[in-house]
Amino acid sequence: MIIKPRVRGFICVTTHPVGCEANVKEQIDYVTSHGPIANGPKKVLVIGASTGYGLAARISAAFGSGADTLGVFFERAGGETKPGTAGWYNSAAFEKFAAEKGRYARSINGDAFSDKVKQVTIDTIKQDLGKVDLVVYSLAAPRRTHPKTGETISSTLKPVGKAVTFRGLDTDKEVIREVSLEPATQEEIDGTVAVMGGEDWQMWIDALDEAGVLADGAKTTAFTYLGEQITHDIYWNGSIGEAKKDLDKKVLSIRDKLAAHGGDARVSVLKAVVTQASSAIPMMPLYLSLLFKVMKEQGTHEGCIEQVYGLLKDSLYGATPHVDEEGRLRADYKELDPQVQGKVVAMWDKVTNENLYEMTDFAGYKTEFLRLFGFEIAGVDYDADVNPDVKIPGIIDTTV
């Protein structure tokens, strides 16, 4: 079939398998052209491995450090008449390129929050890898079925303590509009912490540790975003921020557990990028469009692969890691440069419907968004007939 982008709100409901493969190849080429990660990991588990930062971590480990990788994700395969999810195609492409290099790469499809998927993962590590020396936690999900209670909990994107009104960009209509959000209830805050906080990360590490599949010296990291003042009301000081603060609490006991075997646990702070998760946050498209313009002008613009490759090379496995006073690894320092933030803030209220394209890099934002789904990739013929039914050989599918 010939597949074209069809966007509804903050999701593109079509995906392009050849485009997704080309996008993965571009990221692999970036890593291989920037040289190996010294003393990097060799057997890696990535939880949330199919898109965005998790995929970038899997690529960086495999192609920057020669690592065998096991990826966990929740994606949908394509059929003869309907495309699958971008994450499915990304993972199929990743495994294909890893196999060409003779690297072990296997994937588990299912609900990473569940005990079942944790057990299947442990069994697979024991059978195929023995032990893992890096666990990357990169889940972004709107809801979670708690494995102990069976309750399905939802996360909420709201401010805490007060209603907030802010400027946003309606990406469908391409207009600036005011967005007002009422404060989250305590129940909504608790739900967001349960879905996006550190409990599941801790459950994963506890399960892996009890099963004896963490190597001596094993490290783990979970990805987070802090942002600057302009996004704080909705993000760091909002319900999502409460979940992110929970990561900072949970990491302490995880670190103690791993330190007993010479290992370490860190929260890693990454910059704002276009992902399926960030495009759903009301003020992020406008913020990202301004941020891209400023950072591209300064020559400091980065996407997922640049961020995560740099994180592994410089901080997780580097001699002089970028660490803040909270003990977090920081890869967002270029975004938070006062000059960059100052320019973004100065332009924030000046953007109008009329000057949107000249004042911001909304065009670049739209391109990045479509690239998530395999569109707008250089060298791909989007008028060609493609087969959406792409197999992942050896996948362990717990959803069937």
UniProtKB/Swiss-Prot annotation:
One of its GO terms (biological process) is fatty acid biosynthetic process. It comes from the Bacteria. GO terms for molecular function: enoyl-[acyl-carrier-protein] reductase (NADH) activity; NAD binding; trans-2-enoyl-CoA reductase (NADH) activity. The record marks E75 as: Plays an important role in discriminating NADH against NADPH. Keywords: Fatty acid biosynthesis, Fatty acid metabolism, Lipid biosynthesis, Lipid metabolism, NAD, Oxidoreductase. It catalyses: a 2,3-saturated acyl-[ACP] + NAD(+) = a (2E)-enoyl-[ACP] + NADH + H(+). InterPro entries: Eno_Rdtase_FAD-bd_dom, Enoyl-CoA_Rdtase_cat_dom, FabV-like_NADH_b, Trans-2-enoyl-CoA_reductase. Involved in the final reduction of the elongation cycle of fatty acid synthesis (FAS II). Catalyzes the reduction of a carbon-carbon double bond in an enoyl moiety that is covalently linked to an acyl carrier protein (ACP). This is Enoyl-[acyl-carrier-protein] reductase [NADH]. It comes from Burkholderia ambifaria (strain MC40-6). The gene is fabV.
